[in-house]
């Protein structure tokens, strides 16, 4: 074989005068994106057996002529003719050199374009060719293209610094458009498809346009890269001085023996902390970033703040829950009167937790009017459980970043309030109070209620991710307690995640006990009074409850008692030995009675009925007035009524007309009925006044007075049926505060009497009605 190739090499070195290109030539197919253009000399590496046979045949039988084309897919080892480009270049073998690895380097000179249209032989390929002649006329446009290509290539060569001055000189001497296009195309680092397109383009002008477009695109990118390099170089030069000084300072520090850098101190601190693995990895990454940057840069300050938060969160700190359930019960009883359901739920949690540490903390929601002890009960729960306590008010909150924090890309970014409270408590299992959860707002900054879904979901909060921290923090051990006045303003998805515990309003009896056992001892301590210097009679306490306060809770009662003690302390400082507060002294100490029963009916009246309503502040008693006057049968409604109450009034009118029958037909047709609910500045809505408005209308039409010791509540249907309503306990307590003795309730609300305290229930008469007939019978005297 070596003798054969020595002969091949010898033949290639011999001078050769080509007559004409033969019609049939051996075919050499190149890969790896190589294409030979006419009038160019290209070295080619040859190793495949089939290619070597074609080369040998070219030298021996075809005067060193060979047809060179490219593979469409370079990965194919032995392509078929269909996998080759038809158009290629007729080339001449100038030199063959054998390499140490047994392959050959062949020097080929491209002569002219040709198209292979028929295969004569397969191994090696022998093909018939059609020579593709290039004919063109010189025009001004062609001359302009030649100049543009020269200038663009010179600019490209300047940017890339790839080409020698000899190459540029050779290009400038080429005046033939066809040759210039092929010369420049052979020098550019193009993709295979781009090279093949240029080879197949027979019009020099079109080929120059394609090359000019490629050069313009490359020059634009190179110019941008050059600008960026200039900016980077300038920035590096500006930072060189600072870098040099920093390195010098570092060397001086090492010489002085001060080897503990900031990064070393942080790493040592990290080793002492009991962080979970993912938190350690994050901290290590941030310390490494800090180590590589200037200690005076803004980014370094951001990283220090982040690491400070990461290190100071209580990843492993927790308090041990109280195991003595009886002791926990004593703490709850000592702090609050009543509230049986809430206390039982906390003790149940303690009992289960004592038996199994894997139990998840409940998500509790205390719902009730203001002043009933929702917030203070949450504090008592933390004491009973022996846990840390943290508090956050959600009222008016409208930015979800307050819950989940800001991302560190923002200036002044901080974690959300949840993690801030956890850090303040320094415990991963505190009692966390989210106050006023029913008063959150929605804005363009997001929905905080949606952000709370992850916080209050026991299935998700084990891996709560704050936007600032960017790594999970376990909230599953936190006992979340939320408070609300009403539930209808809480989003359903959020409400579904919480266990609702209703804290209803107190009776006057309960308020007097709370005042005597809880409020007065606490306030006496705050005002430095004792039993020898300050006394208040039971009658005075009851009078304050009846005439100076009218509320579901005890907040206003506390203010009144606080005011009494301040004035008593002043009298003692002015010389009095002690102060005893009696009922008759209240007006002197507290001023005129602010609570009057002006709205209450003093005697039975026609068209005036006591109604019961329920608001977020507790139950209220209101008077529904009905007036019959000459008109055309219209219904007039005043008192700032909502749409539901207006519809209920229209139903009440229809029921009243049906109840009164044909005898009153003309009266309804020739009269207008005016329904009014006093206190017109207060908005009112809901269906529970249906029975009240119906009875008031019937009373005014029939001329029957309604008993003034009676109040009622219930929704009316078009068939005159009375449906159940909510807030029954609050409504009954409100009626009791106003001295009402008889209550008309829907029959289906009879079960709610079980929740009424005996001291209230025993003093009132409850009448359960199913339809309007019985309601009129029991209320009209």
Curated annotation (Swiss-Prot):
Residues 25-219 form the Lon N-terminal domain. ATP binds at residues 368-375. It is found in: Cytoplasm. One of its GO terms (molecular function) is ATP binding. One of its GO terms (biological process) is protein quality control for misfolded or incompletely synthesized proteins. Its main location: cytoplasm. Its EC number is 3.4.21.53. It is an enzyme of class 3 (hydrolase). The active site is at 688, 731. GO terms for cellular component: cytoplasm. SMART domains: AAA, LON. Residues 603-781 form the Lon proteolytic domain. Keywords: ATP-binding, Cytoplasm, Hydrolase, Nucleotide-binding, Protease, Serine protease, Stress response. The keyword Hydrolase applies. It catalyses: Hydrolysis of proteins in presence of ATP. Induction: By heat shock. InterPro entries: AAA+_ATPase (IPR003593), ATPase_AAA_core (IPR003959), Lon_bac (IPR027543), Lon_bac/euk-typ (IPR004815), Lon_lid (IPR054594), Lon_proteolytic (IPR008269), Lon_Prtase (IPR027065), Lon_prtase_N (IPR003111). ATP-dependent serine protease that mediates the selective degradation of mutant and abnormal proteins as well as certain short-lived regulatory proteins. Required for cellular homeostasis and for survival from DNA damage and developmental changes induced by stress. Degrades polypeptides processively to yield small peptide fragments that are 5 to 10 amino acids long. Binds to DNA in a double-stranded, site-specific manner. HAMAP family: lon_bact. Belongs to the peptidase S16 family. Homohexamer. Organized in a ring with a central cavity. This is Lon protease.
